Structures are given as C-alpha cells and as structure tokens.
Amino acid sequence: MEMKQISETTLKITISMDDLEERGMELKDFLIPQEKTEEFFYTVMDELDLPDNFKDSGMLSFRVTPRKDRLDVFVTKSDLNKEINFDDLADLGDVSQMTPEDFFKTIEKSMIEKGDVNAHEKLEKIEEMMEEAVDAVMTQNAEEQKEEESPFEPLDYVHYVLDFMTIQDAITFSKTVTFPIEASELYKSSDRYHMTILLDIQNQPSYYANVMYARLIEHALPGSKTRAYLQEHAHQLLEDHAVTELQKVELV
C-alpha cells in the first residue's frame, strides 16, 4: 500500500490487488457500501503512518475509485463537527433558502445570543475549513483527471436484482446464462426467491447493459427489493457463485 498527502485535508491511499486479497477483500465489496468495507478502511488507516493532523480528526470521509490494477481511496478529514453543535441548526429555520453570507450571519447571531463570546473567531475558523474542503475537492478532481489520462481506466460494473416465484424458476434461469457473470447471490424472502447479478461491462458498448438486462428478464422477474434490503431482511442461500451452483442442479 502507498499513501500520499495531496492537500492539508486529503490523503490518497493506493491499494494493490495483492493487498486486497491478503485482507480477504474483492473489488465487488466496494460497489455497495457495507460494514465490512468500513472496517477495512479503518484497518488500513491503523496500519499506515498517518500525518498528525489526521490522527485526531473529527470526521473522515472515504471515496473509492477502482482501477484496473489497484484501488484508489481518497480520505478527507474535517474538524467542523468540533466547532459547532449541529443540533443548533434546527433553530435557524430553512437554511436551504439562505445565501452563504446569510447563513453565517444567522449562525453568528445564534451563537452570540447563547452567550458564546468567541463566536466571531469560531465562525472564521469554520469558513476557513469550508474553503479548505472546497480546495480538497478541487485537488482530488484534478488528481482523478490525471488518472483518467493514464492507460488504466476504471472498472465498470452494473448490478441487477431479479425475482423468482420458486426455486425451480431460479434453476431454470441459471441454465440459460451463457455469458460471464462477475458475481451472483441467491436470497429467500417470505414469498419468493431473489438473485443478485453483477456484470463487468468494461470495454463494452454503451448499450451493452440494457441488452444484458433484457436477456436476464426473459426468464426472471424484475427485482422487487434492493440488495441492501435483502442483506438485512432476507436469508442468503448461496454466496458469490449462485448461478454456477444452480446450473449443477438437475431438475426432475
């Protein structure tokens, strides 16, 4: 793994495929955020020698960019939550209709009314941190633009959920699949079966995803639940290679 500080508030961590494999992770684990992914990020952070200003950060956000031979993780820190009680924002009215200037004036007035004698200094610091956050985003975008100009393009995946009324329907569907599938899972809910399908559409024409979806629903129903819902509320029957496993089943 390699770490590079690209601004005062942003780190770039490059993780090789070997690093992922050693930690029991795959690229598909990062397509849908889950607890396993978050734990992996913080484990990596613990292993690296972080700059001092990141070790006691109020908040950390992670942005993942898959590459052909690695994973780029941009880590952005913010101490904003240490400077202001966000519960107080409920008293400010509809902040979505305020200009930035009106927003800061309203916060300042609220803080002064509550006896905060250091309101001016705190607001100046908040504004400074917000400017740093904007700068970090611009720096990150510039960094990604450079990456896009490199010969390695990001992997591109499409994810589907399909429904089946019976397990026999799911088996029949699996036997019609003659194209590569990156991953597939089988779930059981109270009234039907559900299958998740992950396709790699890298280097495919723009219409490829739509064509593949049309092929999938020739022998399946459009999904009625999301994968996140199934992970939380349904029972997982097969993991990762559901289609391959069901293809082995002989229907009588």
From Swiss-Prot:
> InterPro entries from the xrefs?
MecA_C_sf, Neg-reg_MecA
Give any GO molecular function from the UniProt entry.
protein-macromolecule adaptor activity
Pfam families recorded: MecA
Report the sequence similarity comment from the record. Belongs to the MecA family.
Q: What is known of its domains?
A: The N-terminal domain probably binds unfolded/aggregated proteins; the C-terminal domain interacts with ClpC.
Assembly, per entry: Homodimer.
Please explain the role this protein plays, according to its UniProt record: Enables the recognition and targeting of unfolded and aggregated proteins to the ClpC protease or to other proteins involved in proteolysis.
Report the protein name in the record.
Adapter protein MecA
Query: Which organism is the protein's source?
Result: Streptococcus uberis (strain ATCC BAA-854 / 0140J)
